[in-house]
Each structure stands twice: as structure tokens, then as C-alpha cells.
Amino acid sequence: MSLVKLYDTTLRDGTQAEDISFLVEDKIRIAHKLDEIGIHYIEGGWPGSNPKDVAFFKDIKKEKLSQAKIAAFGSTRRAKVTPDKDHNLKTLIQAEPDVCTIFGKTWDFHVHEALRISLEENLELIFDSLEYLKANVPEVFYDAEHFFDGYKANPDYAIKTLKAAQDAKADCIVLCDTNGGTMPFELVEIIREVRKHITAPLGIHTHNDSECAVANSLHAVSEGIVQVQGTINGFGERCGNANLCSIIPALKLKMKRECIGDDQLRKLRDLSRFVYELANLSPNKHQAYVGNSAFAHKGGVHVSAIQRHPETYEHLRPELVGNMTRVLVSDLSGRSNILAKAEEFNIKMDSKDPVTLEILENIKEMENRGYQFEGAEASFELLMKRALGTHRKFFSVIGFRVIDEKRHEDQKPLSEATIMVKVGGKIEHTAAEGNGPVNALDNALRKALEKFYPRLKEVKLLDYKVRVLPAGQGTASSIRVLIESGDKESRWGTVGVSENIVDASYQALLDSVEYKLHKSEEIEGSKK
């Protein structure tokens, strides 16, 4: 099958999303990752529109990319200004990109109301701008803004705008669903009509306002489109752009279209999480293909089936996109879940062992009280080890006390925790302050234990979530605390439940520390 070229606009269109902004250094790092995975075109921004994009195009020239081409984005010339005098077009050329992509008006409504020029003059803007760029830049793409809405309003004029781009020898004409409202059945019909009039290579750029961006992109490829534009994780204005993390595996694995290599596809999940990290956003665990839950199984019947034949409940092998099968533990679990988790944790367990059923019943009883182990697998691993008698007790907490004090109305509250622990035959009694009672307790616990276990200095509390459970009444409701901790090697989650938020936090903190000590001991043991 013919090659479908991938055009990424995360660094420009993706940054128009609410709460997303990248430093120049971030954009350079993302560009390298996009290049590694095999993206053909990387749109870096709009030169001249802001200092950040100016700096990007200056700095990216110093970088060595293996195959990706850098694209600069802009608009057609202004009315009543010749291309060689137009600041926007001159700035595009001065940025020295591999590709220039400019957008122009397709919808007669926009021509009249936004540009306030005649329809004929708009055609001249499109032709003149593209012709000028073609004489100065290796490749030129034309984004037909609002094409599908424009076609529905005035099909003859919409086609004329594409013909103007074709006459100017644009290397690819990109049909844009800018408002994101076009349905797949409409898109297919319109592209078929376009192909009766336009012979130039066509691309597709869709937005997700109707939850159809990925579907529309794939339908477009089926209709002969050769370039697909989108963003990593679907970042973009309003509801986002077409998600390349869904489009790429669908093209390659479902539609058998050439786009990137097998080894590159296996880096897809890593790329997704890398971009989330630089955007300072938590990954969407329910995201197709690359999310943590994309291949997660909770029901016991499902788990039993996938252990024999993964395809029973997985539409493809997760390893193909760099993901993995996960077995969740909950009150829906069966023995298969427990055994699968034991195997994951390298814990030997027999399916006929009564302890398996005991663990299962314990989980159901604990979840009835409000515990949840999907995000707290470290707590679950410790639960299994305790049931099997393989849990080593590194220390015991004799008691603790937490004091919150506010001395003056205009001052911050003071939090102090006092704790007494026993390690072997030695007792350690210490105190620590913190930013709130939980932080104070965390500091005191680790302060008491670090002299015995120095490796605890590596641990940091990364995330802390509190949820009031609905079963209780008013202030007497139970509270579930989920804590994520980590060191330089890994991250792990623990859980605690109580009517008292400090006690629930204490349970989760205790599991976090114990898990770290168990893992450190296992690593040290494997080195001997």
C-alpha cells in the first residue's frame, strides 16, 4: 500500500489547548522524540507571531534530525499587499524551514465577514501566496481552513479555492474540519466530490468537537488522502485535534497502511507519556492504545480467558504499541486475577492453595469497606505477602501523635507529628514538622527510620489523593487516601481507608515505606 505521511502539529496547534504551554527547550525535545518515532513532518509554530516560535526555528537548525522535516505555519498574504512585501510570508521564508504550511479561507462566509474582501480577491490571495512560497521554499502545503463547512455552504466556491492552490503547484492540499463538526458520512461524500476536480495530493486535518476526529482521519485515508495531520494525545483547541496516538496504530495495524516502522510503533506509549510529562499533565489512563487501562482486565472471567487466548478480550497485542496487559484486583476478581498478579509480582502461588481464596475474600471485604487496589498495587502486593507468610516486618509503630496549631488568625497553621517506632530491639522516638498533618507524619516516620534504613532517603511522596466515600453520613463518612511514592528507579501506589483522614494517610504511608524496604531487600538479594 502507498505511504501515508504523518504531519504532527503538537508544537503549534497542540499548544492552543487550555492549560498547555511548552518551553522552547520542551519543543526541541519533543521534536527529537517525534523524529525518532518516524513522524514525517513536524510543525514547529508560527514564526514571527511570538518570541518562543522565533527561538524554536533558530534553535532547531542546530539539531540533527534523522528524517523528519520541520514545517513553519502561517497565513496567506494580506489583502492589497503583494507577497514580496507581506511580513508574514517573508518571516516564513526567513525561518528557513523545510516546509511552509499556510492556511487560507475556503468558506465564503469567512471571506465576507473575516477578511471583508471579494470572493475573487480571496482566490488571488491563495494563488499569489503559494506561488511566492514555492519559489523560495522546498515544499509548500496549503491548509484549506473550514473546508468542509465551506463546501456545505457553497461547494462551487470551496472547490475554486482548492483549484487556486493546485494551480499554484501546492505540494499537498489539506482539507480542514476546523470546527470539528463534520460527520464521517459527510466527509466521505465530500472527499469523493473533491477528487473529481482536484488531482493534487490531499491531506486531512480534523478537530474533535464531535468526537469524530480519528474516525474522520481514517475514513479520509480510505478515500485516498495521503497526508494525515494531528497531535500527540489529541492536544488541541477546544476538544482537541485528531489523536496521532490512535491514528498511527489504526493505520498500520488495522488498515495495513505504511506510515512508521514496527520498532518505532513500539515507542508510541513512551512518546505519549513523554509529551504528557512535558505538558505537566497526568496521562489519560483510559486513552486508546497507550493508556494504562487500554489493556487492563478486571472481571475474573475476562482474566481467565486472556491468560489462555489474549485475543478474547484484547483487539491487538499491547506490546505492539509499547503497552502491556494489566490485571486489576477488585471485588469482581476471580482466582485468575490473583494468580496473574502473583506471577507479575514473582510470588509463587498454587491455584488450589486455600490462601488464594482467602486473599480473594479479603479483597472483597476490604473493597466493601472502601479500599481500592487499581491505583495501589504496592498495597496489594504487601497484602498477598502477609497472607502467604512471606512478609518481613522491618519495624513496628508503637504510636504517633499529630498536632495542628494556628496561633494567630493571619498566620499559617503549624503541623507537628511525634512518632515512636521499634526496629529490632531498639526504640526511636522523634518528631518532625510539615506542611500539614500528613506531610508532618510522613517526615516524622521517615526521620525515625532513616538511621536504620538509609535507603528511605531516596523516597519522595509524588501524589496524594483524598476521596470521601459515599456510604457514610456527613462528617462521619469514611475517607480513602491514595498515595503515589517514588524513588529514582520506580513509582508505586498505596491505599488507606478510615473515618479519620490522618489514620487513612498513615496506613498508606506505612505501606509505602514497607514496600520500598521489601523492594530494596529483593534487589540487594538478587545481586548476591
Swiss-Prot record:
Pathway recorded for this protein: Amino-acid biosynthesis; L-isoleucine biosynthesis; 2-oxobutanoate from pyruvate: step 1/3
Keyword line: Amino-acid biosynthesis, Branched-chain amino acid biosynthesis, Isoleucine biosynthesis, Transferase
PROSITE patterns in alphabetical order: AIPM_HOMOCIT_SYNTH_1, PYR_CT
Disruption phenotype: Cells lacking this gene show a great reduction in citramalate synthase activity and are capable of growth in the absence of isoleucine, whereas mutants lacking both cimA and the threonine ammonia-lyase tcdB are auxotrophs for isoleucine.
Catalyses which reaction(s): pyruvate + acetyl-CoA + H2O = (3R)-citramalate + CoA + H(+)
Gene3D superfamilies with a match to the protein in the record: 1.10.238.260, 3.30.160.270, Aldolase class I
InterPro entries hit by this protein: 2-isopropylmalate_synth_dimer, AIPM/Hcit_synth_CS, Aldolase_TIM, Citramal_synthase, LeuA/HCS_post-cat, LeuA_allosteric_dom_sf, PYR_CT
Domain (Pyruvate carboxyltransferase) ranges: 4-266
GO terms of molecular function: (R)-citramalate synthase activity; 2-isopropylmalate synthase activity
GO-annotated biological processes: isoleucine biosynthetic process; L-leucine biosynthetic process
Known EC number: 2.3.3.21
Entry's family note: Belongs to the alpha-IPM synthase/homocitrate synthase family.
UniProt-listed NCBIfam families: citramal_synth (TIGR00977)
PANTHER family: (R)-CITRAMALATE SYNTHASE, ALPHA-IPM SYNTHASE/HOMOCITRATE SYNTHASE
Protein role: Catalyzes the condensation of pyruvate and acetyl-coenzyme A to form (R)-citramalate. Makes part of the main pathway for isoleucine biosynthesis in G.sulfurreducens, i.e. the citramalate-dependent pathway.
Name of protein: (R)-citramalate synthase
Organism: Geobacter sulfurreducens (strain ATCC 51573 / DSM 12127 / PCA)
Upper lineage: Bacteria, Pseudomonadati, Thermodesulfobacteriota, Desulfuromonadia, Geobacterales
Gene expressing this chain: cimA
